[in-house]
């Protein structure tokens, strides 16, 4: 006889193992109480048996834990993890800096990407490495990454290395300084014995003594000191940044018998800050000009400097903003989501002789105003829409452009000069812009209020192309069953950076009733219907918009109309996982659809069919034909707590 087949040999080995295991792990007993605590008792009509549970070995009356970690092949821990035996089982433990992932073993933890795992300094950059992370101080700073501070001279233009808490950081001294409110620093104050030995760092002078260091030699025995200190040089303009100057002390007939190095910076708003050092001797103190009492230049804008004229300080336009040619007049254009704003600088207008400014758009009812947010500019605003203020809309395949003309005059009547500036804002076509620039888009709207966050408006619209830039327009949509439906949902208003729009259930019905029992699900429980290969979900739960497409269809039976419905949810990206994870065959969960969060669109008519839709059916979906963009649903409010 030849050798037995390999299959038979394996069957014999396996059977022997089972027989041995059964014989070893099971014993008969009189009562279940005789079984070990880690055994299972089985009672039938005649026999009571004790069997050791999985992970234990013995006869059932006595069961001992199996050490799976010591038996080759008894555990499935990966090579880069450690097996730890536990009673009846085992666990796989990853080294520090790694995390156990199903099917992948130990994977590196990105401490830089997960909040609370890295402990770098606030200014440092976290760099992930395998099993750990590094903290790197920014350029110009020194430290180990857990602690960073700047070094003198390492900061950028207009900044200095200043103390903040226990560290040194780069900061603008116009914001990072201390104040000196001491009336006796005025050059009009008499003698005294003040000495500025404790002054080190950035200071701003305020109060009745004056707001600026004196720029001329101060007589001795003034400013409550013996040898007054004054600034040997002029104050800088705001565009010069931080400049170095010398402060001189007057004594014994010498206006600069002693000196100290100081730094000065002009700040927006007409005040100065000084990086002062202690004087070389006592009694020496810094003196201020009484004609510069705070308030004389508080109205200076960023285009102006505070200048002294015959001992008095006032605002003057910077030299850079003085122009004589109208062609050099600059305008600032801001293209916002809902409006356009064009502004002209007051200093340039003043240098051109415009003591009074009359500015208006193509529709003269839209006129200029002094910009509250920035006193340097005079502005005019128009909505980014076709029509208001004479704004004209032009559109191509990729952009929508709104254009208008700004007119400028220096008198109510015009004879010699008629200045006009053409301006335009172009917006790339996306779902929102394309809806905004269409006359009658097929769109549905729903208002949702999220507690403590604000009012959100969610819209759903039907588009003609896969780029979602050409919405269907008019009072109805007729398509063949070969055509594709491109459906877009979008979120407006509120804090869009925090919330993602999630389509939880999107389905079709043959009637306008969203609760119709006959439903065809396109998206169900957040995921696409896997048995319909024409369904493509482009975006869901990732941003403030959602998109999907499906080939047009008809319901079996005597149905020629299709209505679309989408249940939407505002997902908090800070506290929830918003992007769905969809794989394999999915089954209906049976969850109830919240009709207060459902958007409705329709009807969509199959091409070649003359649809008859009652007035009530249109009304139930809010289908109103108006001159403004068409809205296809009533506005509802839902509060999330």
Curated annotation (Swiss-Prot):
Gene encoding the protein: UMOD
Segments crossing the lipid bilayer: none
PROSITE patterns named in the record: ASX_HYDROXYL, EGF_2, EGF_3, EGF_CA, ZP_1, ZP_2
Name listed for the protein in its UniProt record: Uromodulin
Cleaved signal peptide residues: 1-24
Keyword Transferase annotated: no
Domain EGF-like: 28-64, 65-107, 108-149, 292-323
Site (Cleavage): 587-588
Known glycosylation sites: 25, 76, 232, 275, 322, 447
Superkingdom of the organism of origin: Eukaryota
Bilayer topology annotation: Lipid-anchor; GPI-anchor
């Amino acid at each position: 006889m030849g050798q037995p087949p390999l299959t038979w040999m394996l069957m014999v080995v396996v059977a022997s193992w089972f027989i041995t295991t059964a014989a070893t792990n099971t014993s008969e007993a009189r009562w279940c109480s005789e079984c070990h605590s880690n055994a299972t008792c089985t009672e039938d009509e005649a026999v009571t048996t004790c069997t050791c549970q999985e992970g234990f070995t013995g006869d059932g009356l006595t069961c001992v834990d199996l050490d799976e970690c010591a038996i080759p092949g008894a555990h499935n821990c990966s090579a880069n993890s450690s097996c730890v035996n536990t009673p009846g089982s085992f666990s796989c433990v990853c080294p520090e800096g790694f995390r156990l992932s199903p099917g992948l073993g130990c994977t590196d933890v990105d401490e830089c990407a997960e909040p609370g795992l890295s402990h770098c300094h606030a200014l440092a950059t976290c760099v992930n490495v395998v099993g750990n992370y590094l903290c790197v101080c920014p350029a110009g700073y020194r430290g180990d990454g857990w602690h960073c501070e700047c070094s003198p001279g390492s900061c950028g233009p207009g900044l200095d290395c200043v103390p903040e808490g226990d560290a040194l950081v780069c900061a603008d001294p116009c914001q990072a300084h201390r104040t000196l409110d001491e009336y006796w620093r005025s050059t009009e104050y008499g003698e005294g014995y003040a000495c500025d030995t404790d002054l080190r760092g950035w200071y701003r002078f305020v109060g009745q003594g004056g707001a600026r260091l004196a720029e001329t030699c101060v007589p001795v025995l003034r400013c409550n000191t013996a040898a007054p200190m004054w600034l040997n040089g002029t104050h800088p303009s705001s565009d010069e940044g931080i400049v170095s100057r010398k402060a001189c002390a007057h004594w014994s007939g010498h206006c600069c018998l002693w000196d100290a190095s100081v730094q000065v910076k002009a700040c927006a708003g007409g005040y100065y800050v000084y990086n002062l050092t202690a004087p070389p001797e006592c009694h020496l103190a810094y003196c201020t000009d009484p004609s510069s009492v705070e308030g004389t230049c508080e109205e200076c804008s960023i285009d102006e400097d505070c200048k002294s004229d015959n001992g008095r300080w006032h605002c003057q336009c910077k030299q850079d903003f003085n122009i004589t040619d109208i062609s050099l007049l600059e305008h600032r254009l801001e293209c916002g989501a809902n409006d356009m704003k064009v502004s002209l600088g007051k200093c340039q207008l003043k240098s051109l002789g415009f003591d009074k400014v009359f500015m208006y758009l193509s529709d003269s009812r839209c006129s200029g105003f002094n910009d509250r947010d920035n006193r340097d500019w005079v502005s005019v605003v128009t909505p980014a829409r076709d029509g208001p203020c004479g704004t004209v809309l032009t559109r191509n395949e990729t952009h929508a452009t709104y254009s208008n003309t700004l007119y400028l005059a220096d008198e109510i009547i015009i004879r010699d000069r008629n200045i006009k500036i053409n301006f335009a804002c172009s917006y790339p076509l996306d779902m929102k812009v394309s809806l905004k620039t269409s006359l009658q888009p097929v769109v549905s709207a729903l208002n949702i209020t999220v507690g403590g966050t604000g009012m959100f408006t969610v819209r759903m619209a039907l588009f003609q192309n896969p780029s979602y830039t050409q919405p269907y327009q008019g009072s109805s949509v007729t398509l063949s069953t070969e055509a594709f439906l491109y459906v877009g949902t979008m979120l407006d208003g509120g804090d869009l950076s925090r919330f993602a729009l999630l389509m939880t259930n999107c389905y079709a019905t043959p009637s306008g009733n969203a609760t119709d029992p006959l439903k065809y699900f396109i998206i169900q429980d957040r995921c696409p219907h896997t048995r319909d290969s024409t369904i493509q979900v482009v975006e869901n739960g990732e941003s403030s918009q959602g998109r999907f497409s499906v080939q047009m269809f008809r319901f079996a039976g005597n149905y020629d109309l299709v209505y679309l419905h989408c249940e939407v949810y505002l997902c908090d990206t800070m506290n929830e996982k918003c992007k769905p994870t969809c794989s394999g065959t999915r089954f209906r969960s049976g969850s109830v659809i919240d009709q207060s969060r459902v958007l409705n669109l329709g009807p969509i008519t199959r091409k070649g069919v003359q649809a008859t839709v009652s007035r009530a059916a249109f009304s139930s979906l809010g289908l109103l034909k108006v001159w403004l963009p068409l809205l296809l649903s009533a506005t509802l409010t839902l509060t999330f707590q």
